[in-house]
Amino acid sequence: MEGSNGSPRMSTEQENTEMHLIECMLKHFKIQKVAISNAIRSTFPFLESLRDREFITGKMYEDLLDSCRSLVPVDKVIYRALEELEKKFDMTVLCKLFNEVNMEKYPDLNLLRRSFECGAKPALKTMNSSSEHCNISDWLRLEATLKASVYMVAFSITTSLTIVIIAIVSQSLQLRKECFNPFVYGLHNRDLQSKLYPWLCCQKKLLP
């Protein structure tokens, strides 16, 4: 029977939502296997990382390398590895596929990762944000990494603009007094900007 706080029911609903998420991601994974295999243009470090983390066995790793030595195209070898990942699919498979090392080595994976993120967002929004399940937290970490990279780019652009502005201001302060004096005194003599005149005279001291 359900407890007074309704927690058994909530737990069941959360499990159903997580299962639905995994099913959606698995379906998308099957559709994108060919695209993923085309994006991974070399076996290293992809196959090695799968072997090291026991996503594939040592024997299968050697079989895949033997296929490469027999001049089987790399994309077909990678496709075989993806078929193995499909058999044991969960969210950790996606996190391993789209980890930082693979993103740097195989930049074509970036667009594919975004397609998975877009597919996952509706289901993630319905989940309890305090969920401690490994698959959910790993996926959220993956999404946070992408957002952090965007923030770093924005910060870099802002810093560059600040440096340019400082350089322009510093160069402006090199104006000579003979250029400064006629302008300021001209304003004063014509009763223009009279309130600004004392301040401008003070700024004169800043000039070389």
UniProtKB/Swiss-Prot annotation:
InterPro entries tied to this protein: HSR_dom, Sp110/Sp140/Sp140L-like
Domain of life: Eukaryota
Organism of origin: Mus musculus
One Gene Ontology CC term in the entry: nucleus
Taxonomy of the source species: Eukaryota, Metazoa, Chordata, Craniata, Vertebrata
Domain HSR: 6-121
Pfam family, any one: HSR
Protein name: Component of Sp100-rs
Gene designation: Csprs
